[in-house]
Amino acid sequence: EYQRVLDLYDSAIWPDESSFYLDIQNAASILARLESSNVNVGDRWEHLAKTSEDRKGDHVLMFTEPHYTMALGSAKKHSQIDSQIESLTQHAKISPKSNKHVIENLTQPICRAIQDFYKGNFKSTVDLLMPLRYDYQPIGGSHAQRDVFNFYLIDAAIQSGQLILAKSLLAERVAVHTNSYGSWEKYAHVCAKLGDQKNASFAQSEVSRLSRQLH
């Protein structure tokens, strides 16, 4: 029911192109998750990128920063991301020690990873996110909200041809998110590409099970 999600995005999630940072954050997360499921989101990123560009330099919440990067990266505004990351560097210099640590060790690497993803530098995305994937908590947001970073990691592993890593990440994911249609679908695809027919068949049976439940 992806069209229904897009309709909700337009009518409730980001109906008036709000510039409130939490609205931008939520909108970017939805679009990123939809695109990870191969859903065409139209020109929605372009509109969100313009609003994100206007928020550059406010640094209200470190968790929101990567969401600005998502919007800017999707719209190919990489010079704006470079400016965003440089602004974060300057902000870190005047921040308390704890916030400085978050900026330098989480916010900036995640922003760079997302920028690299949209540049097609998928291996760099993997290299940046892999060491952080169990340590996102200090950046803020809920566990479910931070999970969007794992979408980038898994997709980058697949796109960079690191299928054994992708299989491992997806196996870990479906063990926890047993009703995640998209995760099972990707797991089936990766296992099939690796010649693991047993796990590919099982994953495909889970896709079929969830499809029946959805319809």
Indicate residue ranges for each PLM-predicted region.
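Helix-coil-helix junctions within alpha-helical repeat/solenoid scaffolds
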Residues: 1-212
